[in-house]
Amino acid sequence: MASRTTIGLAHCYLGHGGGEVATLWAIQALKDEYDVTLITAGDVDLTELNRFCGTCLREGDFRVRQAPVPAWLRRMRGAQALRSALHQRHCRRLAGEFDVLASGYDPCNFGRRAVQFIADLGWDPQLRGTYFAEDEGRLGSLPGRLTRTAYHTLCRALTQRSGWNTFRGDDILVANSAWMAAVIRTRWPSSRVEVLYPPVAFRSGPLPWEQKEVGFVCLGRIAPEKRVDAVIQILSQVRARGHAVHLHVIGPMDGSPYSTRIERLCRANADWIQVEGMKAGLDKERILTAHRFAVHGWAGEPFGIAVAEMAKAGCLPFVPEVGGAAEIVGCPELCYHDASDAVTKIEAVLKSDALQEELREKVRRSACLFGSDVYTAGVRRIVGLLGASTSARRDREWALAR
C-alpha cells in the first residue's frame, strides 16, 4: 500500500482565537487524506481546543512536533515575536521531512513553497502600524524606539533568513477575506492569493426575534486593536439618546494593562455592562442567541470570526466599514466609519422594526457562507493545488539536501 502524502502544518501557539479555529478545522479537513503533523511552540490541549473550535479531533488523527522553546517563554505574555522566531527556525529545520507544508496562522518561511493561511496582518511592520494598536504590556512594544528595534532585530536574527521569498508567487497565500486579499496584493503585487472564509461551527439555532433581549454583545479577545473601550463609548452615547440597552462583554480578561482598564470601565458602568469573561461552546452560544444586536470595534480586522459567530446566532452586528467584517454582514446600514456614525446607525435600527426585519434576512443569507463544510472543502482544494504541483517533490528533495 502506498504511503499517504505527509503534510507539516505550522501554528506557533494555539490559544483562543479565529486562527486556532481555522487551523483545527484544517486538520479536520486533511486528516483522512494526509498524514498530518502539527508543528507548534506551545502546548496542545486537544479537549479544550475541540471545545473552543467545535471540532471533533482525536489523539491519533495527527502528530505533534514541538519546537524547543523554554517553558517560561511558551507562557510569557507579550513574547509573540520571540516565540515565532524560534518556531519558524524549527519549522525550516523540519521542512525536508514533509511532502507538503502549510502555515495555519500567518506566513512561515519554510525555505520552500507552502500554503500560507493568513489570519491577520500583525506580522508585517508596515501593515501592523496601519491596522494594529499596541498594548504597553507587550514585550515587542517596550518603551523606547531603541528597545523595540533591538528586540525585533534579535528576533529576526534568531529566525535565520533562508533566501526564500514567500511573496514572489510560488507560495499560495490564503486570505480570510476579499478585503485582506486586496491589501496583500497591493503590498506584494507578485504574490499568489486565494480567498477562503474561515469556518463557524455554531450548533444552536437562533431564538425567535421577539424572545431576544434588546441588548448588545461584544465578543473577542480583550486587546487594544479590538477597541472594546470604543464599543462601550458608542453604546453609552446610544443610551444617552434614551435607549435603555445593555452590553455583555465576552472575552478573557488576562491581566494585561488593556484588559485591566476595560475591567475598570465595565465596573464603573455595572448597571448596564456585564463582564462574562471567557466563554466557549454552548455557554457562549446561549449568550449570543439571547440578544438582538452586537457591536464590533476593530477597524481593519482581516475577517472577524466573532462577527460571523454573532451573525450565525441571529444578531445584527454593527461593524467598522474598513476590514473583512463588512463582508460578513453585507449591509451598509450595519457598517460605520466612526463612533458618531455608529451611534446614528444603531439608533436608526433600534427605531425601525421593518428595518430590523430586512437586515435580519440579509445577515442570515450572508452567514451561510461561513459553514465548516465550505471551509474544509476549500482547504482540501487549495492544499491539493500545491500537493499536485510537479515541483513539490523537487522542493522536498532540495530542502533535504541543504
Model-derived segments and spans:
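Nucleotide-activated donor-binding/catalytic signature segment of Leloir-type glycosyltransferases, i.e.
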Residues: G251, S259-K279
